[in-house]
Amino acid sequence: MSASSRGAALLRSQQRSICLQCRNQTRVLAPAGVTSAPRRFYSAEASATATATATATTTTTLPPPHPPVTTSTGTHAATSTSSQIYRIKSGVILTRPPLLTRDLTPFEESFYFYQKRLNERLTAPFRKDFYFKKDTAADLDWRIKLKERHGVPAKDIGRYNPRGRMAWNDEVLVGSQTSSRKHMVEKLLADAEMRVSEDGEEIPAEDRVPVEKPMPRRTEADEKGDVKRLDRALDKTLYLVVKKKADKEGEEAKWMFPTGVVPTDEGLHETAARILAESAGVNMNTWIVGRVPVAHHVVRPVFGQKDGALLKKGEKIFFLKGRIMAGQADLTDNLHDLVDFKWLTQEELRSTLAEEYFHSVKGMFAER
C-alpha cells in the first residue's frame, strides 16, 4: 500500500461518523495479503497533535439542517417582499443656474487690483497719437481726463504712476476702497462721460449726457424677499420646491420636490417629465438632464407593534436633474394636491426641507 493510501485509511479509521458501507468499501479496496502498517509517530509532538486531532474529530457534530421556510406574518422580513412594502417614485430637482459670477472676496479684489497695477508697470507706455488725432474733440477730452488722473493712462488703478520713482509701491493700504468693485464702477462711469463737444468746447457738468449704469446685482425680488420669482439670487442656483397639503392619513403638509409614482410602463425620466408638467404646469421651457438619477431618498414602511402587520408602505424616490430656461411654475389645476411653491437657494433649502430629506439630496447640489 502506498503512503497516500495508508494515510487515507488512517483518517477514515479515526472518524467514527463514517458510515459502515464506506468503512467496508475501504477494507475491500485494500489488496489481499497486505496488512496496514502500525502507526509510527516520529516525535512526541506529532503524537500529541494526532491525539488532539482524533479527539476533536470524534466530538465534532454535523450542523443542523436549514430551518424550513415559513409563511408566518409575525416578522417584517416574512411579511412581504421589498416590492410589496415599497412604492417606487420618481422626482425632478428643477434648477435655475446662476446668471452672474459670484462676489469677490476682499483678498481676491486686492489680488486682481495688484495685477492691474503690475501690468501697467510691465507694459509699454500708452501712445495716444495712435488713437487720437491731434486737436480733435477726442484728443481734448483725453487730455482733460488724463490730467484728472494725474497722468496715469489706466482708469481704474487709482493714483499710481507706474513710470515714477514710487512705482514699486503698488499695493493698497488695509481698509482702502480703491480695489473695491463699487469704486471701480464709479470711476469708469465718470471717465466714460464726454467732456468736450464736437466744436471743441468743454461741456458743463449739468449739460453732460449721463452714461447708462449697469443693472444692480440685487434685484427687486431680493429687496422684497419674494421667493417665487426667478430673478432673485442671480449669483446662485435656485431649486423648485412645492408644498403638498396634509392628507387624510394625518400626514402634515411638507415641502418637497415634485414627485410621483412610477407606473410599470414608464421609465424614471419619463415619469419625472410627466410629474413636472402635472405639478408645475406646462408654461415652462424645461430640460431633463439625462436618464440617470442624481439622488435617492428612502421612506421606511410602518408596521404594527403587536402583530407586525404592514400599516403604511414605504417609498423609494429617485430624483432626476432638470433645468428651466424660460417660463414660470403654475400650480393651477395641478393633479398632486400642491398648494404652494418656492424657488430657493441651497442655504434656504436646508431650513425648509426635512432634515433626512435634505441629507438625501444635498450631494447633488451645485457649489453655489
Swiss-Prot record:
Keywords: Mitochondrion, Ribonucleoprotein, Ribosomal protein, Transit peptide. Residues 69-81 have a biased composition (Low complexity). Component of the mitochondrial large ribosomal subunit (mt-LSU). Mature N.crassa 74S mitochondrial ribosomes consist of a small (37S) and a large (54S) subunit. The 37S small subunit contains a 16S ribosomal RNA (16S mt-rRNA) and 32 different proteins. The 54S large subunit contains a 23S rRNA (23S mt-rRNA) and 42 different proteins. Gene3D superfamilies: Nucleoside Triphosphate Pyrophosphohydrolase. Component of the mitochondrial ribosome (mitoribosome), a dedicated translation machinery responsible for the synthesis of mitochondrial genome-encoded proteins, including at least some of the essential transmembrane subunits of the mitochondrial respiratory chain. The mitoribosomes are attached to the mitochondrial inner membrane and translation products are cotranslationally integrated into the membrane. It is found in: Mitochondrion. PANTHER family: 39S RIBOSOMAL PROTEIN L46, MITOCHONDRIAL PRECURSOR-RELATED (PTHR13124), LARGE RIBOSOMAL SUBUNIT PROTEIN ML46 (PTHR13124:SF12). GO terms for molecular function: structural constituent of ribosome. It comes from Neurospora crassa (strain ATCC 24698 / 74-OR23-1A / CBS 708.71 / DSM 1257 / FGSC 987). Belongs to the mitochondrion-specific ribosomal protein mL46 family. GO terms for cellular component: mitochondrial large ribosomal subunit. It comes from the Eukaryota. Residues 53-81 are annotated as: Disordered. This is Large ribosomal subunit protein mL46. The keyword Isomerase does not apply. SUPFAM superfamilies: Nudix. Pfam families: MRP-L46, NUDIX.
